[in-house]
Amino acid sequence: MTLALTAEKIERNRFTGLKVENSTFHHCDFSGADLTGTEFIGCQFYDRENQKGCNFSRAILKDAIFKNCDLSMADFRNASALGIEIRGCRAQGADFRGTSFMNMITTRTWFCSAYITNTNLSYANFSKAVLEKCELWENRWMGTQVLGATFSGSDLSGGEFSSFDWRAANVTHCDLTNSELGDLDVRGVDLQGVKLDSYQVSLIMERLGVAIIG
């Protein structure tokens, strides 16, 4: 299915479970739409000329797949996104505040599920997002807003973390190997259980004025 839509309000069940390829959605309103199991491949959701993205607020994105799509400036606020896959996408400036990636089993028990990989998340907003034990590798995190976010136990390996505020988020027990760690200062960040590779450790030690021999 290939489409070119502009400024359309998407009906709740229009794309549920469908596969949509190489389509263009400019200024489209997916708010409240049920996109459970929907696959978007090679689709454009960003209008470069007007620098505006699409609205996915309050959408149901359970097990939805976005592959090689442009999701720049998309509004995902308060969407239900358990099991979402965003792979090989552009998502600069996307807003994930209030997006739920979790399944609440009881008030004290939950698990998260999300696969956001090889994606440009520069200047995206993940404030207060809970993405624990998720696949978040090989992403670009330049200037990403993460105040109050928790990534505990997630795979953040191979990432680019320039202009990233490490003190703002919980990265305990994360895999950070093969990542460019930018301005990470170990004196102000809880790194309990974090995985680092030997090259990263040597750079961190150098910053602290410690010389590693051998």
Swiss-Prot record:
GO biological process, one term: response to antibiotic
UniProt entry keywords in alphabetical sequence: Antibiotic resistance, Repeat
Any Pfam family the entry gives: Pentapeptide
UniProt cross-references to InterPro entries, sorted A to Z: 5peptide_repeat, Pentapeptide-BTB/POZ_domain
Ranges in coiled-coil conformation: none
Residue intervals of the Pentapeptide repeat domain: 23-103, 116-189
Described function: Confers reduced sensitivity to the fluoroquinolone antibiotic ciprofloxacin (five-fold increase in minimum inhibitory concentration) when expressed in E.coli.
Family: Belongs to the pentapeptide repeat protein family.
Protein name, per record: Quinolone resistance pentapeptide repeat protein QnrB96
UniProt source species: Scandinavium goeteborgense
Gene for this chain: qnrB96
